[in-house]
C-alpha cells in the first residue's frame, strides 16, 4: 500500500493545484449537487483543501458557500469557503485527515438566496446606469439584504422609488439569465457591455493571447463579466 505524502508534501501539492473554480461550470448556480472529493490537506488553521471543489469561494461581494462533509455516516460542518491559490473549507468540527474521501453537501438554501441576490444586484446596477449614468463601484451581498455602492454623475437626479419600480419590473418579467464565454473582440464590440474601460482592465489582468471571460447576461438589461452564481 502506497503511503500518503507527508504534511509538507501535501502543502506543496495543494499550492500547486491552482484549483479550477468548478462552480463556474454549473449554470444555473442554484440547487448545487453534492460532490465527492479527497482531502488533500487539513491546514494548521483547520481549513480543508480538497482534490477539487464545486463550492463558491467568497469573492466579488458574494459570500462563499457553507455546508457539510459526510464521511463514514457522520457529518462535519464547514464555514464560509474562501480561495487564493486553492479553495479552503474552514472546518467547524474535527475528524478529517489527509487522504479521506468525503461527500460535500453545499447549503442549498444559502446558495440559492445568494444567487438570486446576485442576479438582483446586476439588475439594480444596470437600471441605475441606464437611468442616471451611475457606475457600481462596490457591493456586499447577503442572504437577507445587500448593499450597492453607486457613483452618480449627478446625485440630485437619483430617484429611489424609480429605481425600485424599474428593478421590480425586470424581476417580475422573469427574464432569462445566460452565461457566455467570450473573447476580447466580442466583448469590446458588443453594445450591451457597459463600462468598457473597466472591462478591458479585467481582460488585461486575466492575460493571454485571447482570454475567454465568463459573461453573464440578464436578457434585455445587463451583460457583464461575472464569476458569481445566478
Language model features by range: what are they?
Residues 2-230:
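Active-/binding-site microenvironments in catalytic and ligand-binding cores
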Amino acid at each position: 500500500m502506497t503511503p500518503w505524502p507527508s504534511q509538507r508534501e501535501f502543502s506543496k501539492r495543494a499550492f500547486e493545484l491552482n484549483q479550477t473554480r468548478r462552480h463556474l461550470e454549473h449554470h444555473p448556480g442554484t440547487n448545487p449537487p453534492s460532490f465527492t472529493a479527497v482531502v488533500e490537506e487539513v491546514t494548521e488553521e483547520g481549513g480543508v483543501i480538497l482534490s477539487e471543489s464545486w463550492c463558491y469561494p467568497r469573492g466579488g461581494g458574494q459570500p462563499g458557500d457553507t455546508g457539510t462533509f459526510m464521511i463514514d455516516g457522520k457529518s462535519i460542518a464547514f464555514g464560509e469557503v474562501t480561495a487564493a491559490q486553492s479553495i479552503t473549507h474552514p472546518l467547524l468540527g474535527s475528524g478529517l485527515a489527509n487522504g479521506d474521501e468525503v461527500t460535500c453537501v453545499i447549503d442549498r438554501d444559502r446558495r440559492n438566496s445568494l444567487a438570486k441576490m446576485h442576479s438582483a444586484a446586476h439588475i439594480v446596477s444596470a437600471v441605475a446606469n441606464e437611468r442616471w449614468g451611475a457606475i457600481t463601484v462596490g457591493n456586499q451581498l447577503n442572504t437577507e439584504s445587500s448593499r450597492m455602492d453607486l457613483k452618480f454623475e449627478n446625485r440630485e437626479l437619483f430617484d429611489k422609488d424609480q429605481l425600485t419600480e424599474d428593478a421590480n419590473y425586470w424581476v417580475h418579467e422573469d427574464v432569462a439569465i445566460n452565461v457566455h464565454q467570450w473573447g476580447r473582440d466580442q466583448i469590446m464590440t458588443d453594445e450591451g457591455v457597459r463600462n468598457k474601460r473597466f472591462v478591458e482592465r479585467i481582460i488585461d489582468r486575466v492575460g493571454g493571447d485571447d482570454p475567454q471571460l465568463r459573461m453573464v447576461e440578464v436578457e434585455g438589461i445587463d451583460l457583464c463579466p461575472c464569476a458569481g452564481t445566478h
